[in-house]
Amino acid sequence: MPASVLPLVEAAAHWPARGALVGLDLGTKTIGVAVSDPDRRLATGVETIRRKTFTADAARLLAIAGERRAEGFILGLPINMDGSEGPRAQSTRAFARNLARLTDFAIGLWDERLSTAAVERELIGLDMSRARRAKVIDEHAAIFILQGALDRLATQRRTSGPG
């Protein structure tokens, strides 16, 4: 059965309580990939995929998910500052729908507003060269997106209590 593409908290209801999640920062040329630990406390960068075709990109993402025994995907949704969705958000939703056809994992969408800008500031603060930043920014943005989503899910669990 194809997966569902849902807002983060709704997607989480479809995931088991434990198991890694794969976070994605979709760009036009690359996809930053991060994976959580099985307890969903910490996001770690995995790689930056140079985009080729959807089929090739999806195959690599599904391979990573399999290698890491992941239970779901979280995609950063680039919402505009006014809350509207522009072409990049529509492209992300289309990618998520296409990926959902290839997996049973629920796919969660997480507001990634300002994630790349925040990561860029952090890397500049580390005195990283522009060339080095360009190589790692997408993977670091995926970490930022996934960690934000993990923190939100942890808060949700604490405030809603057991069951």
UniProtKB/Swiss-Prot annotation:
InterPro entries: RNaseH-like_sf (IPR012337), YqgF (IPR005227), YqgF/RNaseH-like_dom (IPR006641), YqgF/RNaseH-like_dom_sf (IPR037027). It is an enzyme of class 3 (hydrolase). The keyword Membrane does not apply. One of its GO terms (cellular component) is cytosol. Keywords: Cytoplasm, Hydrolase, Nuclease, Ribosome biogenesis. SMART domains: YqgFc. Could be a nuclease involved in processing of the 5'-end of pre-16S rRNA. PANTHER family: POLYNUCLEOTIDYL TRANSFERASE, RIBONUCLEASE H-LIKE SUPERFAMILY PROTEIN. This is Putative pre-16S rRNA nuclease.
